[in-house]
Curated annotation (Swiss-Prot):
Keywords: Disulfide bond, Hemostasis impairing toxin, Secreted, Signal, Toxin. This is Snaclec 3. It is found in: Secreted. Interferes with one step of hemostasis (modulation of platelet aggregation, or coagulation cascade, for example). Disulfide bonds join 27-38, 55-144, 121-136. InterPro entries: C-type_lectin-like, C-type_lectin-like/link_sf, C-type_lectin/snaclec_domain, C-type_lectin_CS, CTDL_fold. It comes from Echis carinatus sochureki. Residues 34-145 form the C-type lectin domain. Heterodimer; disulfide-linked. The keyword Disulfide bond applies.
Length: 148
């Protein structure tokens, strides 16, 4: 079921209360809901900075995806990334200023880690379900995340 808002730019889709992890989460049209957040995968290949900028322009509060537990990571892999040809996506975790001060672009606390070491931006290798540091200038697909 969905919201019948009259504004095309305010199209929202609310998940049925019977749909488990998506129950009661209202997201922009084309986005998927999980645990009070909305997610959307984009196949466009962009460097990290351009992908983050693109995400911030999609919806208020939207950034490159941040992951806070294995259940959320599994949701992204199974529900979102399955639409992408490449199993590698940008994540919002970075240290672009080389200060050893890792943080999510959405301001969330770094409370879950699954990475290999090197470079200043992170990709999520979905087939292996782990994160890898990589050069921020490379190009990858990405997932945007926004509060519902």
């Amino acid at each position: 079921w969905g919201d019948s808002s009259s504004s095309a730019s305010a199209c929202w889709s609310c998940s049925s209360p019977l749909s488990g992890t998506e129950a009661g989460v209202c997201c922009p049209l084309g986005w998927s809901g999980y645990d009070q957040n909305c997610y959307k995968a984009f196949e466009e290949l962009m460097n990290w900075a351009d992908a983050e900028k693109f995400c911030t322009q999609q919806h208020k509060g939207s950034h490159l995806v941040s992951l806070h537990n294995i259940a959320e990571a599994d949701f992204v892999v199974k529900k979102i990334v399955s639409v992408l040809k490449d199993g590698v996506i940008w994540m919002g975790l970075n240290d672009v200023w080389n200060e050893c001060n890792w943080g999510w672009t959405d301001g969330a606390q770094l409370d879950y880690k699954a990475w290999n070491v090197e470079s200043n931006c992170f990709i999520f290798k979905t087939a292996e379900n782990h994160w890898s540091r990589t050069d921020c200038s490379g190009t990858h697909s990405f997932v945007c995340k926004s509060p519902a």
